[in-house]
Design a protein with these regions (language model features):
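Charged DNA-binding/catalytic regions of mobile-element recombinases
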Residues: 1-151
Length: 151
């Protein structure tokens, strides 16, 4: 099976949608830049949003903080050793591992195979996987329904 990979997603707490993500063979600044660029190209008005993360070195980096500040995004970090602040993303990671990875580890012989499986899973998670918290809809459907009802 393929070795280690690092997934860096942005999860919208409104509907649980994975807004942007990147998978890399190492945790690095390029991975975080790509993830942010994907999020910024998908959503234009980000003023006042809160970006919460753990205290990983990538999220403490000056360039990362500057990019958030340029878009008017407020940076928030969990205190050290406080996993409860990150329970939403940790829950997503647990669901992804349970539904996409566990029992299939030996299928992913290359990074490309793992990347494709995660891309397919995130599409499924956003578009098809229903959740009771959002009225038994998928994250995308919930957002679309909310917007159409709001307008």
């Amino acid at each position: 099976p393929f070795g280690k990979a690092y997934l860096s997603p942005i999860l919208d707490m409104f509907n649980g949608e994975v807004i942007a993500w990147d998978l890399s063979t190492s945790a690095n600044n390029q991975q975080i830049r790509k993830m942010l660029q994907r999020a910024f190209s998908k959503h234009k008005n980000l003023e006042g949003l809160i970006f919460h993360s753990d205290q990983g070195w990538q999220y403490q980096h000056r360039q990362f903080s500057e990019k958030l500040k340029q878009k008017g995004i407020i940076q928030s970090m969990s205190p050290k050793g406080n996993c409860l602040d990150n329970s939403v993303i940790e829950s997503f990671f647990g669901t992804l591992k349970r539904e996409c990875f566990y029992g299939r580890e030996k299928e992913f012989l290359t990074f490309k195979q793992l990347h494709k499986a995660i891309a397919n899973y995130i599409y499924y998670y956003n578009h098809k996987r229903i959740k009771d918290r959002i009225k038994w809809m998928s994250p995308i459907k919930f957002r679309e329904t909310f917007i159409s009802n709001y307008n």
